[in-house]
């Protein structure tokens, strides 16, 4: 039985279509090179294929999270060596944001390890958002479940994007997370949309899900109304001490397939090649860009896990003739050969 998600309205988005799990699964079954080719054509119809949006992600409150997400080293339930830290001071965050901008990042993402902010936290968070926004950067926050009115506070402070991943398919979700439900995720996404914020929503591949469950994950994202402006696709980073430390290895072609299917089903969304790049070969990353990925996290750390080194990223982008996205090169008409 398929789960139908109708998140924001009772009428289909005029520029979207309903994607059944079966239909998405059929895309996954497409011969690999044909699937990548189809995704590349879709990508070129909506984006400049040479431009890659660079984001930097910083943990502004680390560790001690009460949730039991099976992939997360910041959970207080697991012994992973992550030390709990309080919410950082505004000045420290601004300094990191300045460095990120100087290195080419156009978006600065901030994450806090907790179930969700308390009303007493919102004042400081909005102060942080305003300070980063004043640097001329796009701002993105991943602060967990939001109470009523909080999304409006963040919007007023200048937050551009709110990240809140669904993580995996509705069917696989309970195998990964038990302390909050899939519907809790959707509730916060609804509050974010209602406040007028852009949505960044994706998940993690390689958490022992099967292909049908991966198809259910992509279908759930593609059927959000409207579709997320940004879709981060993470490859599981296995961390000792977490329940998923011994998850089965995912074949690299399956990850590339997921990128391609995300691009085809969400043609106007940024598809971000997110966590896990540190362990990816240059060839695998190149295939992901060919399949429609057009955003990466740039910097040596993602919250508390490692990321590809900046020098390595610069070298790879030069090899592939890619360039950081700017307002000028964001949309260039490239007619695909047919």
From Swiss-Prot:
Obligatory cofactor(s): [4Fe-4S] cluster; [2Fe-2S] cluster
Residue intervals passing through the bilayer: none
Cofactor comment text: Binds 1 [4Fe-4S] cluster. The cluster is coordinated with 3 cysteines and an exchangeable S-adenosyl-L-methionine.
EC number, UniProt record: 2.8.1.6
Pathway per the UniProt entry: Cofactor biosynthesis; biotin biosynthesis; biotin from 7,8-diaminononanoate: step 2/2
Catalytic activity, as annotated: (4R,5S)-dethiobiotin + (sulfur carrier)-SH + 2 reduced [2Fe-2S]-[ferredoxin] + 2 S-adenosyl-L-methionine = (sulfur carrier)-H + biotin + 2 5'-deoxyadenosine + 2 L-methionine + 2 oxidized [2Fe-2S]-[ferredoxin]
Residues annotated to bind [2Fe-2S] cluster: 109, 140, 200, 272
InterPro entries, A to Z: Aldolase_TIM, BATS_dom, Biotin_synth/BioAB, Biotin_synthase, Elp3/MiaA/NifB-like_rSAM, rSAM
Keywords carried by this UniProt record: 2Fe-2S, 4Fe-4S, Biotin biosynthesis, Iron, Iron-sulfur, Metal-binding, S-adenosyl-L-methionine, Transferase
Source superkingdom: Bacteria
Keyword Ribosomal protein: no
Assembly, per entry: Homodimer.
Family under the similarity heading: Belongs to the radical SAM superfamily. Biotin synthase family.
Main function: Catalyzes the conversion of dethiobiotin (DTB) to biotin by the insertion of a sulfur atom into dethiobiotin via a radical-based mechanism.
Name this polypeptide is given: Biotin synthase
Source species of the chain: Actinobacillus succinogenes (strain ATCC 55618 / DSM 22257 / CCUG 43843 / 130Z)
């Amino acid at each position: 039985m398929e789960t139908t998600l109708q998140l924001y309205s009772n009428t289909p988005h005029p520029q979207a279509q309903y994607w059944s799990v079966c239909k998405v699964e059929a895309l996954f079954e497409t011969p690999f090179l044909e699937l990548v080719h189809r995704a590349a054509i879709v990508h070129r119809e909506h984006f400049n294929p040479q431009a890659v949006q660079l984001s930097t992600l910083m943990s502004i409150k680390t560790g001690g999270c009460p949730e039991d997400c099976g992939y997360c080293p910041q959970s207080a339930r697991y012994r992973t060596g992550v030390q709990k830290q309080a919410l950082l001071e505004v000045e420290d965050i601004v300094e990191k944001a300045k460095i990120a901008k100087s290195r080419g990042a156009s978006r600065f993402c901030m994450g806090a390890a907790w179930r969700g902010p308390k009303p007493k936290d919102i004042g400081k968070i909005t102060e942080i958002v305003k300070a980063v926004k004043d640097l001329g950067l796009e701002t993105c926050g991943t602060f967990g479940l939001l109470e009523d009115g909080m999304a409006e506070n963040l919007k007023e402070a200048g937050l551009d994007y709110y990240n809140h991943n669904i993580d995996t398919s509705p069917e696989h979700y309970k195998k990964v997370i038990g302390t909050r439900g899939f519907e809790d995720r959707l509730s916060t996404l609804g509050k974010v949309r209602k406040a007028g914020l852009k949505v960044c929503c994706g998940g993690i591949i390689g958490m022992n899900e099967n292909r049908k469950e991966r198809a259910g994950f992509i279908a759930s994202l593609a059927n959000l109304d409207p579709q997320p402006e940004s879709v981060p696709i993470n490859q599981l980073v296995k961390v000792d001490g977490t329940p998923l430390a011994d998850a089965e290895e995912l074949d690299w072609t399956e990850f590339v397939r997921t990128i391609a299917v995300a691009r085809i089903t969400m043609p106007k969304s940024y598809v971000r090649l997110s966590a896990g790049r540190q362990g990816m070969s240059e060839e695998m990353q190149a295939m992901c860009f060919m399949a429609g990925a057009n955003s990466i996290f740039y910097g040596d750390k993602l919250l508390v896990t490692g990321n590809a080194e900046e020098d390595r990223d610069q070298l790879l982008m030069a090899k592939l003739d890619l360039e950081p996205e700017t307002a000028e090169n964001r949309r260039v008409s490239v007619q695909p050969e047919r």
